[in-house]
Design a protein with these regions (language model features):
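Catalytic helix-loop patch of NAD(P)-dependent Rossmann-fold dehydrogenases
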Residues: 1-37, 42-52
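Conserved active-site helix of classical SDR/Rossmann-fold NAD(P)-dependent CH-OH oxidoreductases
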Residues: 18-25, 58-63, 95-96, 121
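Short beta-strand/turn micro-motifs at beta-sheet edges
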Residues: 30, 65-66
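Short, hinge-like loop/turn segments at secondary-structure boundaries
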Residues: 54-56
């Protein structure tokens, strides 16, 4: 987490997260506390919103699909080239992890992420496919807006504590969110 500076596109958020980790570790050391933290990968859920032109990827993607569908469209426009790799975790899984930590008295800090690591293009394609829009096209505009090439998260430490945990597959979770947003 502390190796090199955060990526410029996410600098403030990433730096704040690093400060939180340093503070928690300092409290644990100075006061003998057992505070811990989990670091989730990109999250999505039924409660994610798209406001003021800014949104997390999954919410923005779904909003674009829903908007184009309402206009009778059959394509969506996305920034970049679709090549960056990302891991997305259904927010309900994070709630289950926190509950499991409490139930099992686990006070360790670790990353939590769905191990599925897909390109932005594949994530968009999955989202279209599971929602009955396999024939839709994706237009990538502004290739210079690609962002960081990959943001891999190791969950090896998490799996030491919860080796049997089953994450919601992206296809299943994004379909659930789409159904919720279109009802």
């Amino acid at each position: 987490m502390f190796a090199g500076p955060p990526t410029p596109t996410n600098f403030e958020y990433a730096y704040a997260k690093r400060c939180m980790v340093a503070l928690i570790e300092a409290y644990n050391k100075q006061y003998g506390m057992q505070y811990c933290y989990i670091t989730p990968s990109n999250l999505y859920s039924e409660l994610d919103t798209h406001k003021g032109g800014r949104a997390h990827y999954a919410a923005s993607l779904l909003d674009k699909i829903i908007e184009q569908d309402s206009l009778g469209g059959s394509s969506i426009k996305l920034l970049g080239t679709g090549s960056p790799l990302r891991q997305f975790t259904y927010a309900g899984d994070i709630a289950l992890v926190i509950k499991a930590m409490i139930d099992n008295n686990v006070w360790a800090s670790f990353n939590v992420s769905n191990p599925e690591n897909y390109s932005i293009h594949k994530l968009a394609r999955i989202t279209l496919d599971v929602n009955g829009k396999s024939d839709w096209t994706i237009d990538y505009s502004q290739p210079h807006m690609n962002g960081q090439a990959r943001k891999d998260v190791s969950i090896d430490k998490f799996l030491q504590y919860f080796p049997e945990f089953v994450f919601t597959k992206f296809a299943d979770g994004i379909k659930k969110v789409y159904i919720d947003k279109t009802k």
